[in-house]
């Protein structure tokens, strides 16, 4: 399955969650798209709830179904912790997500582009793989020739706070994942137990 490239705002409203992370999609119309969007939702089946939760998390991080399923399988092999929480932590460790969390991009999609186009380095070496798994302590920075990109400057200026599991040096446009996040620091709108149930049915 290919990555979803359709209208993100309508999809965000349908799923009831901001896929961009900005919250703008739901600010004016916090209901599903359509003439009577806020009156159309009937009772959702258990399977429907599980599927919806899986789609929310997958699309929030911009993964294809295959990528998401593979990551779910990896999370299941981690001996410590809960399966669903481990999945969310692995998603947070993706390089494109760390670039987003550091405030070097306004959205995860924009962060993925920065990585794809070779603007990001890990421990001084260019890495152009968005799914690269960042380990605590690794230094993430912007290449010297890319530091004047307008989209990066705009993203930094528009960033209001950063999660406590990352550190950022605004003067040198670099930062790091200082530790793995706790569940309480991750998306509160997601019920990861439903995702585990979806794949284990």
Swiss-Prot record:
Keywords, in A-Z order: Ribonucleoprotein, Ribosomal protein, RNA-binding, rRNA-binding
The cysteines joined by S-S bonds are none
Q: Name one GO biological process term.
A: translation
The cellular component terms of Gene Ontology attached to this UniProt record, alphabetical and capped at eight, are: small ribosomal subunit
The keyword rRNA-binding is annotated on this UniProt entry: yes
For this protein, the record's Gene3D superfamilies field holds:
Ribosomal Protein S4 Delta 41, Chain A, domain 1, RNA-binding S4 domain
Q: Tell me which CDD domains the record gives.
A: S4
Which SUPFAM superfamilies does the record associate with it?
Answer: Alpha-L RNA-binding motif (SSF55174)
Domain S4 RNA-binding, which positions? 93-153
Matching entries from InterPro entries are given as: Ribosomal_uS4, Ribosomal_uS4_bac-type, Ribosomal_uS4_CS, Ribosomal_uS4_N, S4_RNA-bd, S4_RNA-bd_sf
GO molecular function per UniProt = rRNA binding; structural constituent of ribosome
Q: Any idea what job this protein has?
A: One of the primary rRNA binding proteins, it binds directly to 16S rRNA where it nucleates assembly of the body of the 30S subunit.
Q: Which PANTHER family match?
A: 30S 40S RIBOSOMAL PROTEIN, SMALL RIBOSOMAL SUBUNIT PROTEIN US4M
User: What does the sequence similarity comment in the record state about its family?
Assistant: Belongs to the universal ribosomal protein uS4 family.
Quaternary structure, from the entry: Part of the 30S ribosomal subunit. Contacts protein S5. The interaction surface between S4 and S5 is involved in control of translational fidelity.
UniProt xrefs under HAMAP family: Ribosomal_uS4_B
Identification of the protein by name: Small ribosomal subunit protein uS4
The protein's organism comes out as: Latilactobacillus sakei subsp. sakei (strain 23K)
